[in-house]
């Protein structure tokens, strides 16, 4: 016949503390997010560099204000 229960002399393997479980789950979630973000991208560094450059250009446009000259819109 098969065994339904473990031997009484054997104790259950120690389970990790809740803090350790949370840390492992957080690490796994971060790893999954990184993998999902880079899915389909061959060169991650170039994509990140382009993103930083775009953010810098947007920040520069915000600080410099509207360009001088050009078309003006007036409502009368």
UniProtKB/Swiss-Prot annotation:
A lipid is attached at residues 4, 7 (S-palmitoyl cysteine). It is a lipid-anchor; Peripheral membrane protein. Residues 21-33 are annotated as: VCP/p97-interacting motif (VIM). InterPro entries: SVIP, SVIP_metazoa. The modification Phosphoserine is found at residue 46. One of its GO terms (biological process) is negative regulation of ubiquitin-dependent protein catabolic process. Residues 18-37 have a biased composition (Basic and acidic residues). It holds the Pfam family SVIP. Residues 1-76 are annotated as: Disordered. Disulfide bonds: none annotated. Keywords: Cell membrane, Endoplasmic reticulum, Golgi apparatus, Lipoprotein, Lysosome, Membrane, Myristate, Palmitate, Phosphoprotein. It is found in: Membrane; Smooth endoplasmic reticulum membrane; Golgi apparatus membrane; Cell membrane. Its main location: membrane. A lipid is attached at residue 2 (N-myristoyl glycine). It comes from the Eukaryota. GO terms for cellular component: endoplasmic reticulum membrane; Golgi membrane; lysosomal membrane; membrane; plasma membrane; smooth endoplasmic reticulum membrane. Ubiquitous. In the adrenal gland, it is expressed in the cortex at all developmental stages. GO terms for molecular function: ATPase binding. Belongs to the SVIP family. Negative regulator of the ER-associated degradation pathway (ERAD) of misfolded proteins. It competes with AMFR/gp78 for binding VCP/p97, and inhibits AMFR/gp78-VCP/p97 complex formation that is required for degradation of ERAD substrates. Involved in the regulation of adrenal cortisol and dehydroepiandrosterone (DHEA) biosynthesis. Interacts with VCP. Forms a complex with VCP/p97 and DERL1. This is Small VCP/p97-interacting protein. The gene is Svip.
């Amino acid at each position: 016949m098969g065994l339904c229960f473990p031997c009484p002399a054997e104790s259950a393997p120690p389970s990790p503390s809740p803090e350790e479980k949370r840390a492992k789950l957080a690490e796994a979630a971060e790893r999954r997010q990184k993998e999902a973000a880079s899915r389909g991208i061959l060169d991650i560094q170039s994509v990140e560099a382009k993103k930083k450059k775009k953010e810098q250009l947007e920040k520069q446009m915000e600080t410099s204000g509207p360009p001088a000259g050009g078309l003006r819109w007036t409502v009368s």
